[in-house]
From Swiss-Prot:
Catalytic activity: (2R,3S)-3-isopropylmalate = (2S)-2-isopropylmalate
EC numbers for this chain: 4.2.1.33
Name by which UniProt lists this protein: 3-isopropylmalate dehydratase small subunit
Recorded GO CC terms: 3-isopropylmalate dehydratase complex
Quaternary state and interactors: Heterodimer of LeuC and LeuD.
One function term, GO molecular function aspect: 3-isopropylmalate dehydratase activity
Gene that this polypeptide is encoded by: leuD
Pathway: Amino-acid biosynthesis; L-leucine biosynthesis; L-leucine from 3-methyl-2-oxobutanoate: step 2/4
GO biological process, one term: L-leucine biosynthetic process
């Protein structure tokens, strides 16, 4: 993984609270264990009027022409609640989402997003309101998420955010759980070479 330092992108404003993982990726699409291919099913029951994903719902914000190509998702509190399915961040990442901004995220979803190199940014409700107003009033509005400086830049303003230092390190350096383990590959090899024969 390449790591996340700064990203500037088009924002799609999903004005909904308590969006659960079943809404993000419905259960009928959870049959694969590969991370790829889930983007087309993202918010399926909201994005489409049919069961097979061929009739877009013109009322759903992500289908609006002005938000096509969005790479930052703006939402309300408790985003990603519900079951712990990792397919939810897989679907968002496969769709092209690089960062999410909301007042709060469900804990397991928050961790799973970081493991998949997406930055979940927690801002206050007032700050999120301001960004909603900016994005909805300005077609093509872009926002910058700067993980090195721990700020979001929008409409000439800077909004500071906090993130655990270990998780920030993983995001900046593109490290998932496997990558973290491989950082200690030499020590693992040394340990394995010294295991007594009766334990091997």
């Amino acid at each position: 993984m390449s790591g996340f330092k700064q990203h500037t992108g088009l924002v799609v404003p999903l004005d909904a609270a308590n969006v659960d993982t079943d809404a993000i990726i419905p259960k009928q699409f959870l049959q694969k264990v590969s991370r790829l291919g889930f983007g087309k099913h993202l918010f399926h029951d909201w994005r489409f009027l049919d069961d097979v994903g061929e009739q877009p719902n013109p009322e759903f914000v992500m289908n609006a022409p002005r938000y096509q190509g969005a790479s930052i998702l703006l939402a309300r509190e408790n985003f990603g609640c519900g079951s712990s399915r990792e397919h939810a961040p897989w679907a968002l990442a496969d769709y092209g989402i690089k960062a999410m901004i909301a007042p709060s995220f469900a804990d397991i979803f928050y961790g799973n997003s970081i493991n998949n190199q997406m930055v979940p940014v927690r801002l206050t409700e007032q700050e999120v309101d301001e960004i909603f107003q900016f994005v909805e009033a300005n077609e093509g509005a872009e926002v910058e998420v700067d993980l090195e400086a721990n700020v979001v830049r929008a409409n000439g303003k800077e909004y500071g955010f906090e993130i655990d230092s270990f998780r920030r390190h993983c995001l900046l350096n593109g490290l998932d759980n496997i990558g973290l383990t491989l950082q200690h590959e030499d020590k693992i090899a040394e340990y394995e070479a010294n295991i007594p024969s009766f334990l091997s």
